[in-house]
């Protein structure tokens, strides 16, 4: 039964028994599944969605290593099998879902207005460009994913930008990325977006992201480099939107790094200005809302639009993810990139490569650091400490200037399985076969090598 006044069904302990939940209109099934465990969710009646993406009726979805929720607007029955850390049913008193739906309706009207006037070529109007900001654990990513899913259900093709290097949108952590979403997302994937592009088949249409390499976890580790990467992805996005009226009229949804009280607003302002944002959404962060409102009051972006700053409350369904959980997520994404997941098994290629055939770059140490943001230096000899690191393969020539290499798009990633310093050889794991010396490789500072993929 519900707890009086809260509309909550008490949390149940971890269980592997089959059970059924009946969701009344606007109720949510909230659950947490650890890495190594899994649950299977089947919608047996009604309609329900995970972060905006609808579940198909009588289709079993298996999820592992997630903290998430299933929302039903009109009522549903869910059949659950497997082990959860905890689970509960909540609602319908969480006003955040209604606020999110109202925001979507406003954005959709803006998209439709832009689409009606998109016959003017590159000068045609843009759809809404929305930046979502807030502290760690406020639900930024969940809101962006939900808005993107709802947009695709109307036939729109929004550009989704992940400016938070801590996770990775359809790619590995330590990157900034962007992708056009015009088809359904993968309900069963850990992040809810889908898997990174690979050489294997996919049950859900694959999205091909634009990826740029930061190689650090937090913005404050190298603000100048981070801003330079933002500039690079902004240029690539602008070119993509200029050539595609459907993408331009659908607008943009931007997930941002977590706001740190007192020192994070300048980065958010830089992102907003570079990507010509006209709507900023702050979640449960009054001080940030006040600062951004003051900063953009009376200010127009380069497209001549005023910038609106909107405050939303945090959903009660947002679950905290601790450091251990996030580390497991990062490790899982790396394993999945090379080896696939439970649904698709991939067979990466292992090569023994002469070090001198490769062009591997890294950032200079702090004491030698160039004044130029994003400086790189070529590594002159194989280093044993490179073992078990993931290197970014850049879309550039090996002898291009370091600045051009650093801010080039990423073509893919390789994994250093072993380093033989004496013989000057390296054992490299790559998702596809091919020469590795044709593209420069960049060795970042994160994600750190917590796992041995071949061990």
From Swiss-Prot:
Role, per record: Required for endonucleolytic cleavage during polyadenylation-dependent pre-mRNA 3'-end formation.
Keyword presence, Nucleus: yes
A molecular function GO annotation: polynucleotide 5'-hydroxyl-kinase activity
Matching InterPro entries: Clp1, Clp1/Grc3, Clp1_C, Clp1_C_sf, Clp1_N, Clp1_N_sf, CLP1_P, P-loop_NTPase
Species: Pyricularia oryzae (strain 70-15 / ATCC MYA-4617 / FGSC 8958)
Ligand binding (ATP): 28, 67, 137-142
Main localization, broad class: nucleus
Subunit structure, interactors included: Component of a pre-mRNA cleavage factor complex. Interacts directly with PCF11.
Biological process annotations from GO: mRNA 3'-end processing; tRNA splicing, via endonucleolytic cleavage and ligation
The protein's name in its UniProt record: mRNA cleavage and polyadenylation factor CLP1
Pfam families (UniProt xref): Clp1, CLP1_N, CLP1_P
Subcellular location: Nucleus
Family as reported in the entry's similarity comment: Belongs to the Clp1 family. Clp1 subfamily.
Any one GO cellular component localisation term in the record: mRNA cleavage factor complex
Region entry Disordered, spans: 112-131
Keywords from the named record: ATP-binding, mRNA processing, Nucleotide-binding, Nucleus
